[in-house]
């Protein structure tokens, strides 16, 4: 069934005008952006298939090639989907600009959407000023965290250049289990020793998962 064959009261655009965006399903909202379907498949059905296959959460980080595996999604529609989720990420980033960090949860919320590939471990350094506001976010390494591979010089080089008052280490666990490994503890100890020498405070090391985080400082390990 084509969108034009829907009861006028049930068409996504008309319902949005009448009842607001909150009254629409994710598939209907996406359908308004993509506008047209194919000869045999209306755009609402296409969007329902997209969300059923990948989930709304995964759509935010999916590639153009993966999107085009769904019937009815070509280059133009795939680019529209990528663009709308990228705008949402940038809105989130702009709201967190110069965010003041008061607890590990602040870091967890700040990092939402910033890990480019959650199937791999990423180590970030957050640079803070004297008010504990983030002045820079730096990706230091990608891959399994290992004290033998992480050199303090690489971590603190940018902190010195930025005149950072303090730093916070952040890395993700692809498994979702945020409990620290022995390697995580070794890296933390190594960089804590270096921070004492360089006199740039290591405020915390935070491990993030999909739904929560682990703070070395709040757990008494730093």
UniProtKB/Swiss-Prot annotation:
Asked if the record carries the keyword Zinc, the reply is yes
Q: Can you tell which superkingdom this protein's organism belongs to?
A: Bacteria
Q: What is this protein called?
A: UPF0758 protein Ppha_0935
Q: What Pfam families does the entry give?
A: RadC (PF04002), UPF0758_N (PF20582)
Q: Which InterPro entries match?
A: MPN (IPR037518), RadC_JAB (IPR025657), RuvA_2-like (IPR010994), UPF0758 (IPR001405), UPF0758_CS (IPR020891), UPF0758_N (IPR046778)
One record GO biological process: proteolysis
Q: Where is this motif: JAMM motif?
A: 171-184
Residues annotated as domain MPN: 100-222
Specify which residues bind Zn(2+) according to the UniProt entry for this protein: 171, 173, 184
Please provide the record's keywords in A-Z order. Answer: Hydrolase, Metal-binding, Metalloprotease, Protease, Zinc
**Hey, which family's this protein in?**
Belongs to the UPF0758 family.
Which CDD domains does this entry report, sorted A to Z? Answer: MPN_DUF2466
Record bears the keyword Chaperone: no
Instruction: Please provide, alphabetically and separated by semicolons, the GO molecular function terms listed in this UniProt record.
Output: metal ion binding; metallopeptidase activity
Q: Which SUPFAM superfamilies match?
A: RuvA domain 2-like
């Amino acid at each position: 069934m084509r969108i034009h064959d829907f009861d006028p009261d049930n068409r996504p655009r008309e319902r949005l005008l009448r009842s607001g965006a909150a009254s629409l399903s994710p598939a209907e909202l996406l359908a308004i952006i993509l506008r047209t379907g194919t000869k045999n498949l209306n755009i609402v059905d296409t969007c329902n298939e997209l969300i059923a296959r990948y989930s709304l959460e995964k759509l935010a980080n999916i590639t153009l090639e993966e999107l085009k595996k769904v019937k009815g999604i070509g280059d133009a529609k795939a680019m529209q989907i990528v663009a709308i989720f990228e705008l949402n990420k940038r809105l989130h980033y702009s709201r967190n600009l110069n965010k003041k960090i008061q607890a590990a949860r602040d870091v967890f919320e700040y990092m939402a959407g910033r890990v480019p590939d959650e199937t791999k471990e990423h180590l970030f350094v957050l640079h803070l000023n004297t008010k504990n506001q983030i002045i820079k976010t730096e990706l230091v390494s990608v891959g399994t965290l290992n004290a033998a591979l992480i050199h303090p010089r690489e971590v603190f080089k940018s902190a010195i250049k930025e005149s950072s008052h303090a730093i916070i280490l952040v890395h993700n666990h692809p498994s979702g289990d945020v409990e620290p490994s022995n390697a995580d503890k070794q890296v933390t100890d190594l960089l804590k020793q270096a921070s004492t020498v360089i006199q740039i405070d290591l405020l915390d090391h935070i491990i993030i998962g999909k739904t929560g985080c682990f703070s070395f400082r709040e757990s008494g390990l730093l």
